[in-house]
Amino acid sequence: MTTQFSVAGIELELFRYPASQESNLQAWDAADEHLINTLVEGGQTAVPTAIINDNFGALSCALSRLTPDWPLNVETDARTSFLGAEQNHLRNQLPMDNLTWFTSRDALPGDLALVLMKLPKNLTYFAHQLMRLSQVLPAGCKVLVGAKAKSINASLLEVFAKYLGPASASLAWKKTRVITCISDGKPRALPKEITWDIPEFNLHISNLSNVFAANKLDIGARIMLDNLPQGDFKTIVDLGCGNGVLGLRAAQLYPNANIHFIDDSEMAVASAKANWANNQLPAEKGHFHWDDCMTHLPDGVEPDLVLCNPPFHQGEAITDHIAWQMFLDARRRLKNGGILHIVGNRHLAYHVKLQRLFKNCTTVASNGKFVILQAQR
């Protein structure tokens, strides 16, 4: 893994978060470099700036290195992005009093004069971000968006025009382009939450824009809901909860249990919390954590059941380190005799990892694509 960032005279040491990941993944990409080069070559001065979707702080660290008092407003939906940026600022002895942190639901400041963004994988979420910007940016404000060249097309430029203002793309550099959008100063209304029902379980679901499986039950969750374990569980963790559908069903099946919902996405945790309330479940039994797996779960929480539908993407990167960390955290936090109950694509071979960690693994159910596995501490 390359950790030495060297662009436009800026030298940094940058790590992904957590730092112990696959050696072929690094904390920035060529689109980050392209954005920084564009700013430096254009002679950009330190004005109030929003940095959005900065995976591990490459952009905020670079601007802080250029000008230590550059006023930066950093927006992220991912807890790991926040923690990664924080660690990289500390590692490079950069100031942090010039930084203000925002989630993707917080109101952005009204004095922004520049926006730097990375194009996220979820374009519904991206459109939502543009609409949020339209509510605070003055006419003429410049928004620079870095992306892979193959991701930029006429349809994407139309999204800019619809939700923020006219846009054009730069020439390609290292297979990336920078889109320059000029705000038209016209505020757009934010989209309503997506809502849908799962009638067979009597559940009403709502999703914010950056939540996986936005308007339907994904196939992995479906097979999981049909094969939840039997038992008198007292403390349950829905790890990587998304909209919380597994934990919601668990609350129906195990009414005496406290359910803890955990996700790296703040929008996912907010969606799970809203769904808990909307399905009229007891407020004192639902607990919600925006966290990197179970890193900061309170010490007194000892689950006897962990439900998990692990992701195998972190941003644009395909990686199994998140699943591995989830399994490690489950083994560490489960009480003796507690159960880890997971669903995954068959080809990911999670049974090998569970057997290695727990010294046992049982196949509960499977179909052509997915398998449900169970391991006991």
Curated annotation (Swiss-Prot):
Q: Which residues form a coiled coil?
A: none
Its name, as the record gives it, is Ribosomal RNA large subunit methyltransferase G
Query: EC?
Result: 2.1.1.174
Question: Where in the chain are disulfide-linked cysteines found?
Answer: none
Task of the protein = Specifically methylates the guanine in position 1835 (m2G1835) of 23S rRNA.
Q: Which UniProt keywords apply?
A: Cytoplasm, Methyltransferase, rRNA processing, S-adenosyl-L-methionine, Transferase
Q: Which SUPFAM superfamilies match?
A: S-adenosyl-L-methionine-dependent methyltransferases
Q: Which gene encodes it?
A: rlmG
- EC main class here is transferase
Q: Which organism is it from?
A: Shewanella sp. (strain MR-4)
What's its catalytic activity? Answer: guanosine(1835) in 23S rRNA + S-adenosyl-L-methionine = N(2)-methylguanosine(1835) in 23S rRNA + S-adenosyl-L-homocysteine + H(+)
User: Which Gene Ontology cellular-component terms appear in the entry?
Assistant: cytoplasm
User: What compartments host this protein?
Assistant: Cytoplasm
Q: What is its main location?
A: cytoplasm
Q: Give the protein family.
A: Belongs to the methyltransferase superfamily. RlmG family.
Q: Report which superkingdom the organism of origin falls in.
A: Bacteria
Alphabetized GO MF terms:
23S rRNA (guanine(1835)-N(2))-methyltransferase activity; nucleic acid binding
